[in-house]
């Protein structure tokens, strides 16, 4: 059994770690609430612009934008949004498993996959596997902006226009609630067509005159929509990161508390044994006299 002094040192060390994990838990909780607000405020924009695109595309009779037309898939592009930091449980691991499983399915169909990575964790992981990376961005921080993400979006848009990829997917962790975050894979280009229920009550083509031209408007709207989708994914992934970190740090704090209790019992036993030995020595000495 370890000595009382050694056990006291261990207890002090665990208590110090417990303070750090508790502080990290509180910081993550605060950041998660702020990110949730940004996430909620950005969703209506994405949904509305998607509806506008659907109506405008129906107004351009005889014109089909390339982003709205399905192709035969021979090459796939994926924009993968991960975290820049760790200590968030299995969040990134589950995300990477989703990407690798999808890549495996495409490989079995003899389809190549290119990745555009956002977040240092995904960059480090996929570089270590030697997978072809089209673009990479990291360090977006706790308040991501469209300007920080536009490089990944534009690279995939250019690749799609040039025929270097035939379909583009967006992969990120979707925030369900504080205890649940789910890796999702969503089709980004070509855009899935909205059904009548998603369009709402206004199912008819808008009878508007577009200036300068509906095609020009549609081109701009589609790019803005793709940017907003990647931004939304980055914000959702950030909220998922903070929630996962908060849960992980709470578990670490609780485990530290349990370990302290166990060490305290060991310390008490060691101290009791030490006192008992001292008493035995005193009694033995008195008997010898």
Curated annotation (Swiss-Prot):
GO terms for cellular component: plasma membrane; proton-transporting ATP synthase complex. It holds the Pfam family ATP-synt. It is a peripheral membrane protein. It is found in: Cell inner membrane. InterPro entries: ATP_synth_F1_ATPase_gsu (IPR035968), ATP_synth_F1_gsu (IPR000131), ATP_synth_F1_gsu_CS (IPR023632). GO terms for biological process: proton motive force-driven plasma membrane ATP synthesis. Gene3D superfamilies: 3.40.1380.10, ATP synthase, gamma subunit, helix hairpin domain. PROSITE patterns: ATPASE_GAMMA (PS00153). One of its GO terms (molecular function) is proton-transporting ATP synthase activity, rotational mechanism. HAMAP family: ATP_synth_gamma_bact. Belongs to the ATPase gamma chain family. Produces ATP from ADP in the presence of a proton gradient across the membrane. The gamma chain is believed to be important in regulating ATPase activity and the flow of protons through the CF(0) complex. This is ATP synthase gamma chain. It comes from Pasteurella multocida (strain Pm70).
């Amino acid at each position: 059994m370890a000595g009382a002094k050694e056990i006291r040192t261990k207890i002090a060390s665990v208590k110090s770690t417990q303070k750090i994990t508790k502080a990290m838990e509180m910081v993550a909780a605060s950041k998660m609430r702020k990110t949730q607000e940004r996430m909620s405020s950005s969703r209506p924009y994405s949904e509305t612009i998607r509806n506008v695109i659907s109506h405008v595309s129906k107004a351009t009779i005889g014109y089909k934008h390339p982003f709205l037309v399905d192709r035969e898939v021979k090459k796939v592009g994926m924009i993968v949004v991960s975290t820049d930091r760790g200590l968030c449980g299995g969040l990134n691991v589950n995300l990477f498993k989703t990407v690798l499983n999808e890549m495996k399915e495409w490989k079995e169909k003899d389809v190549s996959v290119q990745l555009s990575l956002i977040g240092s964790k995904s960059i480090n992981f996929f570089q270590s596997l030697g997978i072809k990376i089209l673009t990479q961005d990291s360090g977006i921080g706790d308040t991501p902006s469209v300007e920080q993400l536009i490089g990944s979006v534009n690279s995939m848009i250019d690749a799609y226009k040039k025929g270097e990829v035939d379909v583009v997917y967006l992969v990120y962790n979707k925030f369900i609630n504080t205890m649940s975050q789910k890796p999702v894979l969503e089709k980004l280009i070509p855009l899935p067509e909205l059904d009548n229920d998603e369009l709402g009550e206004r199912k008819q083509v808008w009878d508007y005159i577009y200036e300068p031209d509906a095609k020009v408007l549609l081109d701009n709207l589609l790019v803005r929509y793709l940017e907003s989708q990647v931004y939304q994914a980055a914000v959702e992934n950030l909220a998922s990161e903070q929630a996962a970190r908060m849960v992980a740090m709470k578990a670490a704090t609780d485990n530290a508390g349990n370990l302290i209790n166990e060490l305290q019992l060991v310390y008490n036993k060691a101290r009791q044994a030490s006192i008992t030995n001292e008493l035995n020595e005193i009694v033995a000495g008195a008997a010898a006299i």
